[in-house]
Every structure is written in C-alpha cells, then in structure tokens.
UniProtKB/Swiss-Prot annotation:
Keyword flag Magnesium: yes
PROSITE patterns (UniProt xref): HTH_CRP_2
Reaction equation(s) it catalyzes: riboflavin + CTP = CDP + FMN + H(+)
Binding site for CDP: G95, L96, G97, E98, G99, A100, V191, N192, L193, R194
Binding site for FMN: T178, E186
Function: Catalyzes the CTP-dependent phosphorylation of riboflavin (vitamin B2) to form flavin mononucleotide (FMN).
PANTHER family: RIBOFLAVIN KINASE
CDD domains on file: HTH_CRP
Gene label: ribK
Protein name stated in the entry: Riboflavin kinase
Region (H-T-H motif-like): 1-85
Length: 211
C-alpha cells in the first residue's frame, strides 16, 4: 500500500515523462512517514523498474517509468471497475419531509415509467460508498421521468435509477432541481421502506443499481 501511495504522490508532483526534483523530506511529510522509510520505498520501486532515481549532489530527481505508469493505470482500472458495479453503501438519515409532496405530484408518471405506485415519501440515504450519488450511477443510463406544469407551477425532469434494497425494488430519484447535497440519495419504492425493512436513522444499507 505504501508503494502505491508513493507512486500516487510522485504522479501528483508531475514526475511523469520527465524527472522532477523532489526532496526526501517533502515525500516523508506528504506520506506522514520517516525519511528512512521513503528511501526504502524508493529503492524498492527502483528495483522493480517502476521509477528511475538520479542524485546530483544533494538533489534527487525522480521519474515514473512506463512500467510504473502501467501499474498505476491498472490500479485506476480496478477502482473504476469496482465503482461501476452499481453497489452503493449508505446510512439512513432523516429528510426534510418534502418527499411526500413531490412523490404525489409525480405519482402517475412514476407508475408509467417505473412500473409501480410509489409510497408517498422517500427514504434518504447518506452515501458512504462511493463518494456521491452521481459517482454511484455514472455508468448507468437513467429512466427520464418528464417534467410537467401543474396549477401554474413547473415540475422539472427527474432522473430515476432502479435499485434493489433489502429485496425490494425501488429507485433513486435525482430531480433536475434539488436541495439535497450530492451525498444524499432519495429512494422511492412501492412500500414504506423504513417500516418494511425496520430501518432507523444511522442504519447501514446496501443498494444494488439495476442495470
């Protein structure tokens, strides 16, 4: 893990395609470790052909070699693959109580586009993994619930992402205009999810996005 962090730190210092002057103390401070550990890590990375290190007097120049770049790319690919599997882990939180109103307004369209009559309310989940709602669904094509005008008020489009939570099919809904921060997912379902799954604030939940 420390070698991976070292390569990431070097890449952030632009040691790609050219040698960059870096002090051992800078690396030690950045990685919150000792200069001795930094020297050992650099020696190991050099022995593995991941970096090239040159010393001129008291100056140290380091470059990530193609093998090191391939190693970093492989890690990025694995992380991207993990994030694209559509698994979301979050924590149940209380909402502002406005979900019921909006679900009622969109109810006929939700039935038409998602195939179920929604319970008038949403389950709010604070995303713990991945970082935001959009990160969780970035590779998923949403169901677009079209906006409409009612009693002179405009209701915008809503993006819906079908999910399974505790064996119940529902959907994450992302309104075109929302007051929720990007780490809060609003989930609708045919039932009251809090009651059906016996959930309370702080409970950990797992959602699987249906692709």
């Amino acid at each position: 893990m420390k070698k991976i962090l070292m390569l990431i730190e070097l890449s952030e210092r632009n040691a790609i395609g050219r040698p960059v002057r870096i002090t051992i103390r800078e690396l030690a401070d950045a990685l919150n470790t000792s200069p001795q550990t930094v020297l050992r890590l650099l020696a190991e990375l050099e022995d593995e052909g991941l970096i090239e290190r040159k010393t001129e007097g008291r100056r140290t120049y380091i470059e990530i070699l193609p093998k090191g770049l391939d190693f970093l790319q492989d890690i990025c690919d694995k992380i991207s693959n993990a994030l694209s599997k559509g698994v979301i882990v979050g924590e149940v939180v209380s909402g502002l109580g406005e979900g019921a109103y909006y679900v009622r307004q969109y109810e006929p369209l939700i039935e038409e586009y998602l195939g179920f009559k929604p319970f008038p309310g949403t389950l709010n989940v604070k995303i713990l993994f991945p970082k935001t709602v959009l990160d969780a669904v970035c590779n998923i094509r949403p169901v677009i619930i079209p906006g409409f005008v009612k009693d002179g008020r405009t209701f915008g489009d809503v993006k819906a992402y079908p999910v399974m939570i505790g064996g119940i099919k529902g959907a994450i809904v992302v309104p075109s205009r929302t007051i929720h921060p990007p780490r809060i997912a609003e989930i609708i379902a045919p039932v009251n999810l809090r009651e059906a799954l016996k959930l309370k604030d702080g409970d950990r939940v797992r959602l699987e996005v249906i692709q």
